[in-house]
Regions:
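Short alpha-beta junction capping motif
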Residues: 205-253, 265, 340-346, 366
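Flexible loop/turn segments at secondary-structure boundaries
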Residues: 60-67, 141, 235-238, 352-353
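Short amphipathic C-terminal alpha-helix that caps PH/PH-like domains
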Residues: 359-371
Length: 409
């Protein structure tokens, strides 16, 4: 008995020149998947008179074209994506919940949210209190407090409103709101992102050209200029894939077949991002190596570029993970040296989401990088190679249909 499907997937990734990224792809897509499972579970727990949920699936399923969507592998063993005790923070008989309108705030706003307790244990939670703390990335306490609890068994109870102070956060910061019921193992925590309100409209310095028409500024670039290019989505449909915030579910081939048979739009089929949090382009945009909620407007407006023509050792600053059927090298943010100039390419329409503080901060972080000495692309492309990358037909392998017993009509 051998995992023949894994052998096929490995060969495909080797042929795509990305086998060295296999573990990173698994961890980045898997950790993001765990956060998505958490969001779905908490959505259920926030629902009054909720009757339970069935999780499809806690473990990988090797059938139906291979559905490696589990937090555990096919043998019910950990894949290293999330610790069991962390999973129980949001999937337990008692779960503290923080209900808020958004995860990203500016420091001049009043961060507000409701605390609720889902109590499906065997007894009431009386004469107890919930402690909360808001800490920054260095574990410094920004604010804290307590709420009294009187929660009946089987009840979803609103226990109070939180308005943690965030005005003291002066730079872009990921903060953590921790909730815990004193004298019990029940706790939960939430990542929030705080951005400075000042300079809401990030502006480039005079030597940076920001454009959606590179042809008009190609001479400036090749002669030594710095260009931030937002390629037109409509002009490069054959060289890009759609933006997908959540991971593609089950497997791409099966649901692509279903959608095509029903004449419905096919999912972009991607699995989140992989990036280096320490890259200087992200110095003022706190992130993990995988997708999290602060990326939402950026990815929703994205159209990742297919970079298969580039050498195997080329890595985008922000790479989008493709599915095992296609294995494209996809870029959301990437850079080149072109002639004597420096080019940074962003495959997201940030103008469309400048009302979102996280999108403004991402743009600001990019500009700060381009203004610094750290902006020194090492991968050289000629103007002709750059044009081919954005206009030439992309080679794609044959993908056979995968029919399901249900027609889904």
């Amino acid at each position: 008995m051998k995992p023949r499907n894994f052998e096929i997937f490995k060969k495909r990734l080797e042929e795509a020149g990305m086998i060295n990224l296999a573990y990173d792809f698994m961890m980045a897509s898997g950790k993001w998947s765990a956060l998505l499972y958490r969001a779905d579970i908490e959505m259920n727990l926030r629902t009054p008179e909720w009757g339970g949920f069935q999780l499809l699936d806690l473990q990988d399923y090797p059938g139906q074209g291979s559905a490696y969507v589990g937090i555990l592998d096919a043998f019910m063993e950990s894949k290293g994506l999330i610790a069991p005790e962390e999973w129980r923070h949001f999937c337990s008989e008692v779960v503290p919940l923080f209900c808020t309108e958004k995860f990203c705030w500016t420091n001049d706003e009043a961060l507000t949210g409701e605390v609720e307790i889902a109590n499906y244990s065997e007894s009431d939670l009386n004469s107890k209190q919930l402690s909360w703390t808001l800490t920054d990335s260095k574990q410094q306490v920004l604010d804290k407090g307590v709420l009294p609890l009187q929660v009946k068994q089987g009840e979803l109870a609103k226990v109070g409103t939180l308005k943690p102070a965030i005005a003291s956060v002066r730079k872009a910061e990921k903060v953590t709101l921790a909730l815990s019921i004193d004298g019990t193992p029940y706790r939960n925590d939430y990542s929030l992102w705080i951005y400075p309100a000042a300079d809401k409209e990030g502006a480039p310095s005079e030597d940076i050209c920001v454009t959606d028409d590179l042809d008009a500024h190609l001479k400036y670039l090749t002669e030594g200029g710095k260009v931030l290019w937002f390629p037109s989505k409509d002009k490069h449909k054959d060289q890009t894939v759609g933006g997908l915030f959540q991971t593609d579910y089950w497997n791409y081939r099966m649901f692509r077949t279903i959608c095509e048979n029903l004449d419905r739009p096919v999912s972009p089929g991607t699995l989140g991002i992989l990036t280096d949090p320490g890259h200087p382009a992200l110095a003022d945009f706190p992130t993990e190596f995988h997708t999290n909620w602060q990326w939402f407007p950026i990815i929703k407006q994205s159209y990742p570029m297919i970079l298969d023509r580039l050498s195997d050792d080329y890595r985008p600053i922000v790479q989008v993970i493709d599915n095992v059927e296609r294995n494209h090298k996809l870029g959301l943010l990437f850079e080149f040296k072109v002639g004597n100039g420096k080019l940074l390419v962003c495959m997201s329409d940030l103008k469309a989401v400048q009302d979102k503080p996280e999108a403004r901060q991402f743009y600001r972080s990019i500009l700060e990088y381009m203004e610094s000495s750290a902006f020194a692309p090492s991968y050289s492309l000629s103007a002709k190679d750059l044009q081919d990358l954005f206009t030439a037909k992309v080679k794609t392998g044959e993908m056979k249909k995968l029919f399901n017993i249900s027609s889904y009509k």
